[in-house]
Amino acid sequence: MTAEPATKKIKLELSDPSEPLTQSDVIAFQKEALFRCINRRRVDFEALRKQYELSRRECIDVSRKLANIMALIVTLARFIETFCTDANEKQLCREIAQGDETLIVQRSDSFMKLLTKYGKPNTTDSNTNSNASDHIQELTTELKNLRKSKEELFYENSQLTEEISALKEYYTNIIRKYDRDESFTIKRVFKEDKTDAVKELREDEKESNENNIKSGNKDSSAINGDNTSKKSEKGDELVQAEDERKEDAENEKLELDLKFSDLRAEINSLSSTIKDLENIRRENEEELIKTRSEVSNLKKQQIAAADQDPDFKSYDHESLLAKIQHLTEQNAELSEINSSFLSKFQVLAKEKEIYTKKVREEFQKSLDSLVEMNSSLEKDVVRIRTARDDLLSKIAILEAEKSKTEVLSDLQHAIDILKEQWTKIDQRSNDTKSSSTQDALIKEIQDLEKGFRELSDLTHKKYSEIINHESVISKLTVEKTKADQKYFAAMRSKDSILIEIKTLSKSLSKSNELILQLKDSDRLLQQKIGNLHKQLDLSQNNERRLIDSSKTETLKIIDLNNTSTKLKRSLEKLQEESNKSIADMTHLETKLNDTEIELKHFKQKASHLESKCEKLHDTLFRGNNKNKGSSDEALVEELANFRTLVYCSLCSKNWKNMAIKTCGHVFCENCCKERLAARMRKCPTCNKAFSSNDLLTVHL
């Protein structure tokens, strides 16, 4: 039953079952009774806690589902509001769109009619109409089936709950019985161990008797001295067992006779009481018929008096009550209108806040996105510019290298021309054989060498000058390209800045437009709020007027009630006197009937008890003749111990039914209450303090 581990039972030091009860046995019995009561309370608490957890989870699920359904209904109402043409239908949709549960439940029928009205398709296409009608019929059949299943499930649920409650009671009774069966103190007090031992002895005697009979039948053929002695001993045992059986049978017969006589006496008393009650019922029915006829005659007399006296109708209590009810209904309607206006005002204020928040968030998002785009574009421009500068510098270097290669190619061409001339001169010198010509040629060659050297010096100088000039030109060109690059970069940055300025101006204009729109919406909302305030003032004025009118009406009603009460007092006095006399008569009659029934019951009881006492006297007289008088002292002592166990130790009159939680001692309820009333708030046995909250009812 519980999630806690089973508590270990304390070993109780009980006295021997053959001996009479002691004070320690009584204390152990009381403690174990308290323990059983606390354990039962703990089990009930654990079951309640589990039920509470389950119901809480189910409540959360139901609330979540209900919220989803409410949101769906609100969206449906808002959607249907766009199609509505009638003002009442729009008003209904708006009221349902507010999301008030009580309003939705009240206006559910009208809202369902709206849904069926606007849920139908147009009459243009016949196929769609037929499909829609089929679909609606299917939905209606499904709805009917669902309702049937709901009713069946509800009936099954009720049956299951009844079965669960019955099972719970059954298992709690079983647990209680199991706890009582397991307790050693109950066995010790009510002598269950002795009865068990007696039963075991009887079963052993029966088995031994059967075995003896079988062995006697088997050994009847053998004739020995030892067998005869054994048979004699077994015969004595059989005689004793038969005597005990006879005594048990007589006791059982006596108990059954007593029970039968008790039941017969109860049946007789019940039959007599039933007859008396039937007679009383008949008399009451006759009196009821008479009173009803008298009431109908009185009503007829009142109607006739009202027809004769026209002023009598003005004092009609029912009409005044109807007026009061009508005024209260009007007051309730006005309060509902006032609350609806207040809820609308709150909804509009919430919508305004939500709208402003959304606009601010969108504006902030667009601004952040523009800033991010601007930063990314600036990074891209810087990267492109650096790449462009690198490429332009590479191009300038390549152009400078190209000019140097051209100069070298020109020099190589001049050297080739000089080599050709030199080869031609060598050929000419080989062709000429004369010495004169050779000398002239040598002189010419020397002159040519000088001229060549001078030319080569001049060419070298000019070459160096050209190289210097070209290096200066290349440096100037590089600087010019750099300046051009800087100029173009500045122009491009100017273009990008102009583009950024344009985009920012566009965003600024958009933000200004948004601000203007927000201002317009704010103005409209303020106008709506002002209108709502005016409507509120009007409704409050109407409410005040109605309250004043209701006050005047109530004053009139009070005056009329006073006049009616004055007129009714005389009637009430007469009716009270008649009712008192009737009540006294009926009270005396009921007392007479009760006393007669009790007399009969007591006479039957007395006769039954006399017969019972005679039977018990006879049985006791027979038993005392057989048994000795030594067992009487033990019985008296055991009865005294049982009285100390069951009856209160303070008054020794009432049963013990109230335990003190602080110490565990048990007394009767009257003694505990008397001690608390006399401010004696200490236990009489152990002097421990206790209060009214420490008392616990116990059933021993």
UniProtKB/Swiss-Prot annotation:
Effect after changing residue 665 to A: Abolishes ability to monoubiquitinate histone H2B
Coiled coil (UniProt feature): 126-406, 555-620
Recorded superkingdom: Eukaryota
Misc remark: Present with 2980 molecules/cell in log phase SD medium.
Example of a GO MF term: scaffold protein binding
GO cellular component assignments: chromatin; chromosome, telomeric region; HULC complex; nucleus
Summary of the function given for this chain in its UniProt record: E3 ubiquitin-protein ligase that mediates monoubiquitination of histone H2B to form H2BK123ub1 in association with the E2 enzyme RAD6/UBC2. H2BK123ub1 gives a specific tag for epigenetic transcriptional activation, elongation by RNA polymerase II, telomeric silencing, and is also a prerequisite for H3K4me and H3K79me formation. It thereby plays a central role in histone code and gene regulation. Also modulates the formation of double-strand breaks during meiosis.
Protein name per UniProt: E3 ubiquitin-protein ligase BRE1
Predominant localisation class: nucleus
Keyword DNA-binding on entry: no
Membership in a protein family: Belongs to the BRE1 family.
A Gene Ontology biological process term: regulation of DNA-templated DNA replication initiation
Regions of compositional bias (Basic and acidic residues) in chain numbering: 200-209, 228-250
Species in which this protein is naturally found: Saccharomyces cerevisiae (strain ATCC 204508 / S288c)
Description of how the protein assembles with itself and partners: Forms a complex with the E2 enzyme RAD6/UBC2. May interact with LGE1.
Catalytic activity: S-ubiquitinyl-[E2 ubiquitin-conjugating enzyme]-L-cysteine + [acceptor protein]-L-lysine = [E2 ubiquitin-conjugating enzyme]-L-cysteine + N(6)-ubiquitinyl-[acceptor protein]-L-lysine
SUPFAM superfamilies found in the cross-reference section: RING/U-box (SSF57850)
EC number(s) reported in the record: 2.3.2.27
Zinc finger (RING-type): 648-687
EC primary class: transferase
Compartment(s) of residence: Nucleus
Substitution effect: residue 663 to A: Abolishes ability to monoubiquitinate histone H2B
Keywords, in A-Z order: Chromatin regulator, Coiled coil, Metal-binding, Nucleus, Transferase, Ubl conjugation pathway, Zinc, Zinc-finger
Pathway where it operates: Protein modification; protein ubiquitination
PANTHER family according to UniProt: E3 UBIQUITIN-PROTEIN LIGASE BRE1, RING FINGER PROTEIN-RELATED
Stretches for region Disordered: 200-250
Disulfide bonds: none
